[in-house]
């Protein structure tokens, strides 16, 4: 059984309504921030489910609670660097499960990566270096106590100013 939750693009409505959590399957996959139509879901406690979440569009832009997810992944080219890097965070509880299928390719077997200290293959050095510089900048721009909270607040302030300018002048579309 698959619960498919999507909005009807033809309706022009950007609101997505999720079914009650207790009616969802044991595995939940979702994209937290869909940029084409401007849909961003809040962090949701899916209660005892395996939760796999694409956070590419909002990774490093606001705090995320890692305890709500089983697997988080983000394509670096959105916010963390340049194309060529995918950042993956896996709850260790999933590692033994991932190795049970002989059909899982080594590149998709997170236990293989853990055993190799995350360098199972030659990484895209330039792309990884770009991510390092981005993280260094984030740390430089904020204090140690609440790094992403500060960047999120700053981004919201900038957005408010831009939307106000758009509304007041009608210049931006």
Q: Which residues does each PLM region occupy?
A:
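Active-site phosphate-binding strand-loop segment of PLP-dependent enzymes
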Residues: 4-59
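Active-site cofactor/substrate anionic-group-binding motifs, chiefly glycine-
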Residues: 1
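Active-site C-terminal subdomain of aminotransferase-like
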Residues: 76-163
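Conserved hydrophobic/aromatic beta-strand scaffold that supports enzyme active sites
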Residues: 27, 71, 85-89
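A short secondary-structure junction signal
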Residues: 14-16, 38-43, 61-67, 83-86, ...
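Conserved active-site segment immediately N-terminal to the catalytic lysine
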Residues: 52, 66-77
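Conserved PLP-binding catalytic core of the aspartate aminotransferase-like
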Residues: 172-173
């Amino acid at each position: 059984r698959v619960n498919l939750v999507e909005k009807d693009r033809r309706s022009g409505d950007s609101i997505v309504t999720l079914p009650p959590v207790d009616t969802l399957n044991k595995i939940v996959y979702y994209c937290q921030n869909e940029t084409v139509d401007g849909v961003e879901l809040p962090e949701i406690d899916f209660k005892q489910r395996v939760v796999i979440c694409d956070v590419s569009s909002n990774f490093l832009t606001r705090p995320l609670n890692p305890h709500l997810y089983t697997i988080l992944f983000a394509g670096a080219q959105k916010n963390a660097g340049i194309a060529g890097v995918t950042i993956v965070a896996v709850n260790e509880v999933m590692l033994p499960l991932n190795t049970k299928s002989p059909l899982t390719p080594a590149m998709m077997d997170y236990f293989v990566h853990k055993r190799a200290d995350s360098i199972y293959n030659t990484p895209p050095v330039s792309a990884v270096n770009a991510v390092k510089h981005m993280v260094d900048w984030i740390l430089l721009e904020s204090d140690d106590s609440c790094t992403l909270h500060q960047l999120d607040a700053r981004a919201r302030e900038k957005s408010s100013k831009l939307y106000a300018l758009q509304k007041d002048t009608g210049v931006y579309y």
